[in-house]
Amino acid sequence: MVTHGKKYQDAIKLLDQSAAYAPAEAIDLAKKMSAAKFDETVEMHLKMGLDPKNATQQLRGVAVLPHGLGKTVRVLVFAQGEAEKAAQVAGADVYGGDELIKKIEAGFLDFDVAISTPDMMSKVGKLGKVLGRRGLMPNPKSGTVVPAEDFKKVIEEARKGRVEFKLDRSGIVHIILGKASFEGQMLLENMTSVVDAIIRSKPTGAKGQYIKSAYLATTMGPGVRLDLRAVSAMGGV
């Protein structure tokens, strides 16, 4: 049985667990219930009406948060030759080809986003076990496998707050919206960007209710149930 400390128990007293809150109200409540000694992350969890085993119902995409994630993002680029020089000019924190791959195989993971040119992917693929489980593997569907001329745009997006989302095996999408220290309006605008991107990425094989439930929570706080109608309206549907 899971037990929670006094701070959690005090926080949950502020929450009506039978209610579904409007996004702005839920954000304010989640911020009030954030009682950890560190700046907690604010996350949204969406239960989708999708079958993770159905190839026509896969959900994966990218959202750019207008107010970022509240942290410095280190960007790595896999590239060689002229493309490696382009990565340097575009402002990548780490860049390289074969030697960089060896460095990662040896344990280097001091980066938050990985980008690759298409020609490097046959080599980068062998890092699947290392990068894949950490959500760092470059992927064309998430816009991180690009030609050198797109490096600047993708790197700038990553630094501004580019976040990837993907349906997990339980049919849930987990996505970070920012920090508990953010102003409520900043988190609301980040949430709007995320919901809009998820709705725009609706798979062709989706049937029935697309978003079945939505919750907001800080790292150590209780989940706040969101009003589905209000959430869906954020994406213009």
Swiss-Prot record:
For this UniProt entry, the molecular function terms from Gene Ontology, in alphabetical order, are:
rRNA binding; structural constituent of ribosome; tRNA binding
Which Pfam families would you find in this protein's record?
A: Ribosomal_L1
Gene Ontology annotations of biological process type = regulation of translation; translation
What keywords does the record list, in alphabetical order?
A: Repressor, Ribonucleoprotein, Ribosomal protein, RNA-binding, rRNA-binding, Translation regulation, tRNA-binding
Q: Name one GO cellular component term.
A: large ribosomal subunit
Superkingdom of the source species: Bacteria
Query: What protein family is recorded?
Result: Belongs to the universal ribosomal protein uL1 family.
Its biological function? Binds directly to 23S rRNA. The L1 stalk is quite mobile in the ribosome, and is involved in E site tRNA release. Protein L1 is also a translational repressor protein, it controls the translation of the L11 operon by binding to its mRNA.
| Oligomeric and partner information | Part of the 50S ribosomal subunit.
Write the protein's name. Large ribosomal subunit protein uL1
Q: Which organism is it from?
A: Dehalococcoides mccartyi (strain ATCC BAA-2100 / JCM 16839 / KCTC 5957 / BAV1)
